[in-house]
UniProtKB/Swiss-Prot annotation:
NCBIfam families: tigrfam_recA (TIGR02012). Can catalyze the hydrolysis of ATP in the presence of single-stranded DNA, the ATP-dependent uptake of single-stranded DNA by duplex DNA, and the ATP-dependent hybridization of homologous single-stranded DNAs. It interacts with LexA causing its activation and leading to its autocatalytic cleavage. GO terms for biological process: DNA recombination; DNA repair; SOS response. This is Protein RecA. Keywords: ATP-binding, Cytoplasm, DNA damage, DNA recombination, DNA repair, DNA-binding, Nucleotide-binding, SOS response. The gene is recA. Residues 345-354 have a biased composition (Basic and acidic residues).
Length: 354
């Protein structure tokens, strides 16, 4: 629909005044001088990258990963950091729980010598550090472990047993308003790890909720629910966990998709095992009886041997990964965000701090 000449002149004058006052680029047409594709970082799990619809976690956004204890939350974020570092990106880990194990992080592929780490005393300090790193424009990925450990200063300085209703929720709400714009401007990915709490007196529906109030639920572009659904065994020994991740909220693609993968103790996500499964599913890898073949060449008898072969031949593994991504991501279009709060419940505004 055409705009008449007087309106065009008035609009041009208004845009010129806005840019003069607030700087160039402060207002523009949505499709002007910018890529519509979202830049992403791999999660370290091929099936989860595909479930997210964009090939990974989106840069310049807030992401929340929550689940029960020992479900793989920290492992998943360390895999994201390792993937980002392999691309030459700078990463920071805000260890509010004071529980980061550098030896374990190194086993997962994290370059701990170049990983920025902070163990803040208060929640406010942790969030100010996040904001300072984002505003610097020099940090690409920030992980906060965890929201539940972001204790307000007033609570730390008070007595155990004092009531501090809503303090953490208010602190998170203020931080989200401040951080969202800075993260977008600097194209920094901020990942919050969160814990689960139970609502008291819930008779129907899911009683689970996350800590820190509701602000994070609104501001997060992606919310991932991670659960341990079984054990990985070698004979009688448990060597890992079968893990399921549900994309509860997704603003960059269709939500509610799921991914299942293995987390092996001391190794992290079993990426090459996923590659074998997805390769067979997409008919890139042939399976005849117990034998697996690629391009007519046998790569192993049994999944374990095929996985080991791919690990020893990274060039072939990369080739298969590229083909899988092209097949499974090319037809996924972005859709509006129809996702709601945890497990299908609508979000109710509250000042309660769980």
């Amino acid at each position: 629909m055409a705009i008449d000449e007087n309106k065009q002149k008035a609009l041009a004058a208004a845009l010129g005044q806005i840019e003069k006052q607030f700087g160039k680029g402060s207002i523009m047409r949505l499709g002007e001088d910018r890529s519509m594709d979202v830049e992403t970082i791999s999660t370290g799990s091929l099936s989860l990258d595909i479930a997210l619809g964009a090939g990974g976690l989106p840069m310049g956004r807030i992401v929340e990963i929550y689940g029960p204890e020992s479900s793989g939350k920290t492992t998943l974020t360390l895999q994201v950091i390792a993937a980002a570092q392999r691309e030459g990106k700078t990463c920071a880990f805000i260890d509010a729980e004071h529980a980061l194990d550098p030896i374990y992080a190194r086993k997962l592929g994290v370059d701990i010598d170049n990983l920025l780490c902070s163990q803040p005393d208060t929640g406010e300090q942790a969030l100010e550090i996040c904001d300072a790193l984002a505003r610097s424009g020099a940090v690409d990925v920030i992980v906060v472990d965890s929201v539940a450990a972001l204790t307000p200063k007033a609570e730390i300085e008070g007595e155990i047993g004092d009531s501090h209703m809503g303090l953490a929720a208010r602190m998170m709400s203020q931080a989200m308003r401040k951080l969202a714009g800075n993260l977008k401007q600097s194209n920094t990915l901020l990942i919050f790890i969160n814990q689960i709490r139970m609502k008291i007196g819930v008779m129907f529906g899911n009683p689970e909720t996350t800590t820190g109030g509701n602000a994070l639920k609104f501001y997060a572009s992606v919310r991932l629910d991670i659960r341990r659904i079984g054990a990985v065994k070698e004979g009688e020994n448990v060597v890992g966990s079968e893990t399921r991740v549900k994309v509860v909220k997704n603003k960059i693609a269709a939500p509610f998709k799921q991914a299942e993968f293995q987390i092996l103790y001391g190794e992290g996500i079993n990426f090459y095992g996923e590659l074998v499964d997805l390769g067979v599913k997409e008919k890139l890898i042939e399976k005849a009886g117990a034998w697996y073949s690629y391009n007519g060449e046998k790569i192993g008898q049994g999944k374990a041997n095929a996985t080991a072969w791919l690990k020893e031949n990274p060039a072939t593994a990369k080739e298969i990964e590229k083909k899988v991504r092209e097949l499974l991501l090319s037809n996924q279009d972005s859709t509006p965000d129809f996702s709601v709060d945890d497990n299908g419940e609508g979000v109710k505004e509250t000042n309660e701090d769980f």
